A protein has these predicted regions:
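Nucleotide-activated sugar donor-binding and catalytic core shared by glycosyltransferases
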Residues: 1-234, 244-382
Length: 382
């Protein structure tokens, strides 16, 4: 008797989603009839293609090309084109991760009565100005099964009234991703290629909408970057998102000579640069998880997040990183302190939610377990 596998569609749209889901995608390819879709929300070689290659991922089955002339058009395209794709492919379930506009494909799946599984559910920074916070709240309450990174996230969802019986803590997928590529990360020759010395540079990544598009935040952050170069007299390697580069060029901002703008780096190169940096200064959501993992592996690095809020309280609980705010004074204080702490041997505690290296297996099993339950209990199918 031939048994057909469950048909799953996974929708991604940005580099962080591709990275976080990389090991999950491989498991889904193995155990499901898996259809991988890229919305094209952020698509160019540096931001996506290089990561598919670096993470040993196959190409998506379909690109939706949702980028429009305005934010409203792009969001509309995500919903409309994912609706058409879902209706044509007819998957048994949809998997999405995170809080980008690509996750709004959950709206289309819900209208088509397709069970929605949402990874990274329940993250909250409680800053209503951020578009990601809006997306999180929408998708968490649309999803049929929420897969959280931490007990913090599960408690937030429970307090908001989501179904307790369909909310699970899987842990962060980043430990599994980093573990899978650990030898290549450690063995990268990126320092030689960029003529950098271990501990002799700062690594910078800043691309969030609130930091780049807001004029006041942009000015404060860029002034802080130049202040870092002046204070430490070390190269500041800025891994620059194309959108950030465009905004910087439009404003005609001039960097200190020690600030080196660089196109987005590969996953393995960037993480090698993190583990060898004097300090990492970033607004990336993965910074707390990466810092926690490297600390647990015996390769701690000073990590400063240039934001005023975080959706990773479980990492802040354990001292895995420091919120540096955006003002020059606060950023310099945070860098000084984290560097001094590492020099003094003051280590962060282990973050339990960031240690599991079998998150992909958990996700696959939960999807297999709950698709038919959602069909029956929510949609009254069968």
């Amino acid at each position: 008797m031939t048994v057909q596998k469950l048909k799953l569609m996974t929708i991604v749209g940005t580099r962080p989603e591709v990275i976080r889901l990389s090991e999950v995608i491989k498991k889904c390819d193995r155990y499901f009839d898996h259809y991988l879709v890229h919305t094209g929300q952020n698509y160019d070689y540096e931001l996506n293609q290089i990561f598919f290659e670096d993470l040993d991922l196959r190409q998506p089955d379909e690109y939706l090309d949702v980028a429009g002339g305005s934010l409203g058009e792009s969001i509309g395209n995500v919903i409309a084109r994912s609706y058409d794709c879902l209706r044509r492919v007819r998957p048994d379930a949809l998997l999405i991760l995170g809080d980008t506009n690509s996750c709004l494909s959950a709206i289309a799946a819900k209208r088509l009565h397709i069970p929605v599984f949402h990874m990274e559910a329940g993250n909250r920074c409680f800053d209503e100005c951020l578009p990601e916070e809006t997306n999180r709240r929408i998708v968490d309450h649309i999803a049929d099964v929420n897969l959280c990174y931490s007990e913090h996230a599960r408690r937030y969802l429970n307090a908001e009234g989501t179904a307790r019986e369909r909310t699970y803590v899987t842990g962060s997928p980043m430990a599994e991703v980093l573990s899978a590529h650990w030898d290549r990360i450690v063995g990268s020759d990126v320092l030689d290629r960029l003529d950098l010395q271990k501990g002799g540079y700062l690594l910078l990544s800043a691309h969030r909408e609130e930091n780049i598009d807001d004029e006041g935040n942009f000015k404060a952050l860029m002034e802080a970057v130049n202040a870092l170069a002046r204070r430490y007299e070390l190269p500041v390697l800025y891994s620059m998102h194309p959108r950030s580069r465009k905004r910087i060029e439009e404003r005609g901002f001039s960097f200190h000579p020690l600030v080196r703008a660089h196109k987005p780096l590969s996953f393995t190169d960037y993480n090698n640069l993190q583990m060898n940096a004097f300090c990492v200064v970033s607004d990336s959501g993965t910074l707390p998880e990466e810092a926690a993992y490297f600390n647990a592996k015996g390769h701690p690095f000073p990590a400063v997040c240039v934001r005023t809020s975080t959706e990773r309280p479980e990492a802040l609980d354990k001292g895995a990183f420091v919120l540096g705010s955006l003002t020059t004074e606060r950023v310099l204080q945070a860098v000084d302190m984290t560097v001094a702490m590492l020099s003094d041997g003051v280590a962060a505690s282990v973050v339990p939610d960031y240690r599991d290296e079998n998150v992909s297996a958990k996700v696959v099993r939960i999807i297999q377990s709950y698709t038919s339950i959602v069909d029956k209990m929510v949609w009254r199918k069968g």
